Structures are given as structure tokens and as C-alpha cells.
């Protein structure tokens, strides 16, 4: 009998361990920021969207409470819907939907406050604000200064891992520099909460959800995989802006 119990344990232990590893792997880092209706937009702005033609935007675009006349993208630049609070938006494609936009803008503010309020931070003042050249693990990062991406930066984690970047100053990405994802990390799980402005340099590559208190400026030729959610304006210059995907895609070399 004793031998049978012992043998049973020998059988049960690997079965239990196998079931643990076969199950869902727990995500590292904080839980994701809930975007609500703001998460249905690739670009959302309270005071307007300017553009140097041509840009390409995949996903929905919206402006509120400012008039639709401040949404300066052309219909052929957007694969998705363009929502405005009145009939002054781009013709013939803009959709007058003030209630949806009011809700989305409210949710954008709630998401910003949520991201800004996450405690405790796992990393504070990392690199004294210079994160270029670093590989970042999942977690909450906090700076009381500007954050600069002067060389390429890497986010390494699984598809379920989450990063929240709490930035009290501005976010600056240098020209032709890249935000790179490895290990399965997804742009939809990287949240940049920026109290100042966000400036992405020319021909750069950026990943993540930007929740900016003020301006988001995307300079010539830059590609963004994520969302641009600004409490003031968004400026584009011949850019490619794609809503984040649900699956990991290896970045081209």
C-alpha cells in the first residue's frame, strides 16, 4: 500500500506540474490601463489634428470638443472612420458623432489619470531620463524629468506583459531611432503617460499607447504602431500610424 501511494505521488507530481505549465502564464508588470471608448481610436485629440500630406492612418480618428474643421486629414489617408462633433469635418467621409466623442475624450482623461496614479513604481528616474540603449522589462517606470530616446530602446517581454511609463516632463525621440519589441511584447500593452508634450523625430519608429497631457508631434516619415491620444493637438507629417495588433510581429531589421 505504501508503495502504491509512493508511486501515485510520482505520477501525480509530474501531472500537476504539467498542468501548471500548460495553463496560462501570469503576466509580468502591472495590469493594463483601461482605455474605454478611447481605445477604439488610433488618433484622438481635443484641439485638432494637422497633417502634411500624405499620411496613412489605420483605425479611427476623432476630434472633440473642437469643431471638425480642425481635423485636417483627407479621407483617402484614413482606413477607418473620422468622427467629428459637427458637420465641418472632412467631406464626404467624416461622421458627426458628438456623443461618442464626448465619451471617448472622457475615457481618455480617465485612462491618463489611471496611468499617472499607478503605485508603487518598480523603477524611478531610470537612466536619469535617458532610456536609449536600454532593454526594459515589464513594470511601472517613473520620471520627474523629461524622457529621451537618443538611441534605440527595447521592450522585452511576453504578449501579456505590461509597461507603464510615467513621465512628468516631455517625451522626446531622436531622428531615425527605434522602439523595438522582443520576446512577444505588444504595443497595445505599453502605455506612455506624458505630462508634457510628446515629440517623435523624423523617420523614427515608435511603439505603444501615448496618453499625452498636451501636444503629440510626429515628424516627417515616422511610423507609429499604437495610439496617439492627446488632450491638446496631434500634428502629422507624412506618417504611417497603425492601430496596435493583438499578435506579436517580428520587427524588420
Curated annotation (Swiss-Prot):
Q: What is this protein called?
A: Ice-binding protein
The task this protein performs is described as: Binds to the surface of ice crystals and inhibits their growth. Has ice recrystallization inhibition (RI) activity (the ability to prevent the formation of larger grains of ice at the expense of smaller grains), which may protect membranes from freezing injury. Has high thermal hysteresis (TH) activity, which is the ability to lower the freezing point of an aqueous solution below its melting point, and thus the freezing of the cell fluid can be prevented protecting the organism from ice damage. The TH activity of this protein is 3.8 degrees Celsius at 14 mM.
Effect noted on mutating residue 233 to Y: Significant decrease in thermal hysteresis (TH) activity compared to wild-type. Has 2.6% thermal hysteresis (TH) activity of that of the wild-type
Q: Its family?
A: Belongs to the ice-binding protein family.
> What happens upon changing residue 235 to Y?
Has 17% thermal hysteresis (TH) activity of that of the wild-type
Q: Where is this site: Ice-binding?
A: 67, 220
Residues making up the signal peptide according to the UniProt record: 1-27
- Give the residue ranges of motif Ice-binding site motif (T-A/G-X-T/N) 2: 232-235
Quote the InterPro entries the UniProt record gives. Ice-bd_prot
Where is this protein chiefly located? Answer: secreted
Motif interval(s): Ice-binding site motif (T-A/G-X-T/N) 1: 220-223
Show the disulfide pairing. Answer: 75-93
Organism, per UniProt? Colwellia sp
**Keyword entries, A-Z:** Antifreeze protein, Disulfide bond, Secreted, Signal
GO annotation, cellular component aspect:
extracellular region
Q: Where in the cell is it found?
A: Secreted
